[in-house]
């Protein structure tokens, strides 16, 4: 499935902002803007507490959760109806697919509050570091959220609103009286049943009593209405188990346990037990001066409940089996790339630190993100990554500046598509990159988190050399000077896209730019454009028969609709050839 030759990382980096490229037979993804939540106006200041710090889809893709630096968790739910027809069948027939996942705001709740550790004289901020969905039951939503020290297990349920009915007084009889009017009414003679002594209508500014009063007293009745409210309830609090900041949580496929990781330890928890955890990984040396690496991320295998992986600041990924021993000091496999001789520098170890890892949906591959690259690892091949994708190679000459402003320590996340054919990660300037993983693919797309994801390319166009084939396929190259913006200024390294998530079943990405949540969807470019490019290229070569045969043999099998379109485009190609001749 994956590219064994290293993924053509250099060629991937050559594709600029808003561009994509692919070889024949490998359809590219056409990305479009879908939705935005919390979009800020031009010149509007962003509050620190509103910046999004975590994004996560649930396994079905029907719900999305975000956490922010203010300790809040916001839930979104999918609103569009799902098609009953097979998506793969529709793509095979080139049927137009206009639907894309649409979400709406569902609920929010305060997950964490700022705290103070009096024993260590340490402030614990409320920022949400990670969110993970748990298996649900009874139409409820369950998730884990964590800050630096405390993990909480939340259950969100729909509750019907209860109302009080059958009141003793008609709501229309209630006035707007005051205490003075009430005292006035008490001075007048009333019967024990509330009636007037003179058997006449008694009216004050509070209550209108009927003549003779009320014959009986009716108790209020509580009834459930059709209105539904979402109620978030904290079921468990898992605290006092980590001496260092928690950087990861991951739920197990057994639905009963999860892990939490800090810089030196990984703990195993049972969801139903909050006062006990088991330390399964401990990399703390007897003497802290001998410490050479720390844990940066940990993730459970998606299907094997006994397997998990964790990454380190030295760029290695260790796979451990919980069945080996209670304390997993020894790993079953280690994945690391050996550095080339003579290439070591002061920044080598810093940029090699892995900030995030993700398993593919089938559990066969691991995607890792270090500061400069994305790497795809095959669990069956620990000699090196099967693909390496350069994310922002143009920043390598600026590592000194990045070190001075601490940007070199930014932790970018990564994600894989549900089918495992694409990977994505963020960069600076609110950009994120999407790469193709199919064998031989050179697909690379750079998008900006805005309503117009191609805005950077439109503002700063270039005119590289193009062939007629690349023109027909819509291949566009970005600016050569990718380290500057449209005005020629250096990128503002504070505008960075750290967090993003891929929909588990569809080609849709949610990403966070400061306090704004942007969502994009993609459609595969129809193969008829590849057919057109091949026909037009053959036309440019003066219709030589051997060239025709070679071009047409490289075209993938066509569906019924594609065949009709191919005939139409063949006519265009012939016309173009006549003009050339």
Curated annotation (Swiss-Prot):
GO terms for molecular function: protein phosphatase regulator activity. InterPro entries: PP2A_PR55, PP2A_PR55_CS, WD40/YVTN_repeat-like_dom_sf, WD40_repeat_dom_sf, WD40_rpt. Keywords: Repeat, WD repeat. The keyword Coiled coil does not apply. Residues 1-27, 172-192 are annotated as: Disordered. WD repeats lie at residues 47-86, 123-164, 241-279, 290-330, 349-387, 492-530. Residues 14-25, 172-189 have a biased composition (Low complexity). It comes from the Eukaryota. GO terms for cellular component: cytosol; protein phosphatase type 2A complex. PANTHER family: PROTEIN PHOSPHATASE PP2A REGULATORY SUBUNIT B. Belongs to the phosphatase 2A regulatory subunit B family. PP2A consists of a common heteromeric enzyme, composed of a catalytic subunit (subunits C), a constant regulatory subunit (subunit A), and a variety of regulatory subunits such as subunits B (the R2/B/PR55/B55, R3/B''/PR72/PR130/PR59 and R5/B'/B56 families). The B regulatory subunit may modulate substrate selectivity and catalytic activity, and may also direct the localization of the catalytic enzyme to a particular subcellular compartment. This is Serine/threonine protein phosphatase 2A 55 kDa regulatory subunit B alpha isoform. It comes from Oryza sativa subsp. japonica (Rice).
């Amino acid at each position: 499935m994956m590219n064994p030759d290293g993924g053509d990382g250099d060629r991937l980096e050559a594709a600029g902002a808003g561009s994509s490229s692919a070889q024949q037979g490998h359809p590219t993804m056409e990305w479009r803007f879908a939705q935005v939540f919390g979009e800020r106006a031009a010149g509007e200041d962003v509050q620190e507490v509103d910046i999004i710090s975590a994004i996560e889809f649930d396994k079905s893709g029907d719900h999305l959760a975000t956490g922010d630096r203010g300790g809040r968790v916001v839930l979104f739910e999918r609103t569009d109806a799902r098609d009953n027809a097979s998506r793969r069948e529709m793509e095979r027939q080139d049927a137009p697919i206009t639907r894309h996942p649409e979400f709406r705001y569902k609920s929010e709740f305060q997950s964490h509050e700022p705290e103070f550790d009096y024993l260590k004289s340490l402030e614990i901020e409320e920022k949400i570091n990670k969110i993970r969905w748990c298996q649900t039951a009874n139409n409820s939503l369950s998730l884990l959220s964590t800050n630096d020290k405390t993990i909480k297990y939340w259950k969100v349920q729909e509750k019907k609103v209860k109302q009080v009915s059958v009141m003793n007084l008609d709501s229309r009889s209630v006035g707007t009286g005051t205490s003075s009017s009430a005292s006035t009414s008490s001075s007048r003679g009333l019967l024990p049943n509330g009636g007037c002594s003179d058997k006449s209508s008694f009216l004050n500014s509070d209550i209108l009593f009927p003549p003779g009063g009320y014959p009986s007293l009716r108790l209020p009745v509580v009834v459930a209405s059709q209105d539904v409210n979402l109620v978030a309830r904290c079921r468990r609090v898992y605290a006092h188990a980590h001496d260092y900041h928690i950087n990861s949580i991951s739920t197990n496929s057994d639905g009963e346990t999860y892990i939490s990781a800090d810089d030196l330890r990984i703990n195993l928890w049972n969801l139903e037990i909050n006062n006990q955890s088991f330390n399964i990984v401990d990399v703390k040396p007897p003497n802290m001066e001998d410490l050479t690496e720390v844990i940066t991320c940990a993730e459970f295998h998606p299907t094997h409940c006994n397997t998990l992986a964790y990454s380190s600041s030295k760029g290695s990924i260790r796979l451990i089996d919980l069945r080996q021993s209670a304390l997993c000091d020894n790993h079953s496999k280690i994945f690391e790339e050996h550095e080339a001789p003579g290439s070591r520098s002061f920044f080598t170890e810093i940029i090699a630190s892995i900030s995030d890892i993700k398993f593919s949906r089938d559990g066969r591959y691991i995607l890792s993100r270090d500061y400069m690259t994305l790497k795809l690892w095959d669990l069956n091949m620990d000699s090196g990554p099967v693909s390496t994708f350069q994310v922002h190679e143009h920043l390598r000459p600026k590592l000194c500046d990045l070190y001075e402003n601490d940007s070199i320590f930014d932790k970018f996340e990564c994600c894989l598509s549900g089918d495992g054919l694409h990977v994505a990660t963020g960069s600076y300037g609110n950009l994120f990159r999407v790469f193709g993983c199919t064998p031989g693919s050179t697909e690379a797309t750079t998008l900006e988190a805005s309503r117009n994801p191609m805005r950077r390319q439109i503002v700063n166009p270039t005119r590289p050399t193009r062939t007629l084939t690349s023109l027909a396929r819509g291949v566009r190259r970005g600016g050569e000077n990718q380290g500057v913006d449209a005005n020629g200024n250096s990128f503002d390294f504070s505008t960075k896209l750290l967090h993003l998530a891929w929909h588990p079943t569809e080609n849709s990405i949610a990403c966070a730019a400061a306090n704004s949540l942007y969502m994009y969807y993609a459609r595969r470019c129809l193969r008829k454009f590849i057919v057109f490019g091949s026909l037009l290229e053959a036309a440019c070569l003066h219709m030589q028969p051997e060239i025709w045969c070679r071009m047409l043999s490289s075209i993938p099998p066509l569906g019924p609709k594609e065949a009709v379109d191919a005939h139409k485009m063949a006519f265009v190609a012939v016309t173009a050839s006549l003009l050339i001749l």
